[in-house]
From Swiss-Prot:
Keywords: Ribonucleoprotein, Ribosomal protein. Pfam families: Ribosomal_L12 (PF00542), Ribosomal_L12_N (PF16320). Transmembrane segments: none annotated. InterPro entries: Ribosomal_bL12, Ribosomal_bL12_C, Ribosomal_bL12_C/ClpS-like, Ribosomal_bL12_oligo, Ribosomal_bL12_oligo_N_sf. Homodimer. Part of the ribosomal stalk of the 50S ribosomal subunit. Forms a multimeric L10(L12)X complex, where L10 forms an elongated spine to which 2 to 4 L12 dimers bind in a sequential fashion. Binds GTP-bound translation factors. Forms part of the ribosomal stalk which helps the ribosome interact with GTP-bound translation factors. Is thus essential for accurate translation. The keyword Ribosomal protein applies. GO terms for biological process: translation. This is Large ribosomal subunit protein bL12. It comes from Endomicrobium trichonymphae. PANTHER family: 39S RIBOSOMAL PROTEIN L12, LARGE RIBOSOMAL SUBUNIT PROTEIN BL12M. Disulfide bonds: none annotated. It comes from the Bacteria. Belongs to the bacterial ribosomal protein bL12 family.
Length: 125
């Protein structure tokens, strides 16, 4: 280094503005022919990323189609969500809509069962 210690260089960099730091990074990229972007992790063929192997614990319950028994579906929506009659009817009329978000798997399955019993289709995401 030409006259600057590491501490002096760090102090100089820490006093720069964001724009100056951005220009410094660009200049260093050009000077050394590198990129400051983080490299993407390589996935070996035949294996899936660790995130995909974890089992999902929370689900969104989405009402797909109402079927023929709209009144019974509205009743189930009210039971599951605690909504008033008008809000539940609006939700059913606007299907496909999310009925409940971030529920446990067992609860989501139970809600799905209630809807399928009255003829509605439900999707868990």
């Amino acid at each position: 280094m030409a006259g600057l210690s590491k501490d002096q260089l760090i102090e100089s960099i820490s006093s720069m503005s964001v724009i100056e730091l951005s220009e410094l990074v660009k200049a260093l990229e050009e000077k050394f022919g590198v990129s400051a972007a983080a490299p993407a992790p390589a996935v070996v063929a035949g294996t899936s990323p660790a995130v995909a192997t974890e089992e999902k614990t929370e689900f969104n319950v989405i009402l797909g189609s109402v079927g023929t028994s709209k009144i019974n579906v509205i009743k189930v929506v009210r039971e599951v969500t605690g909504l008033g009659l008008k809000e539940a009817k609006d939700l059913v009329d606007g299907a496909p809509k999310t009925v409940k978000e971030n529920v446990a798997k067992a609860e989501a399955e139970e809600i799905k069962k209630k809807f399928t019993e009255v003829g509605a289709t439900v999707e868990l995401k």
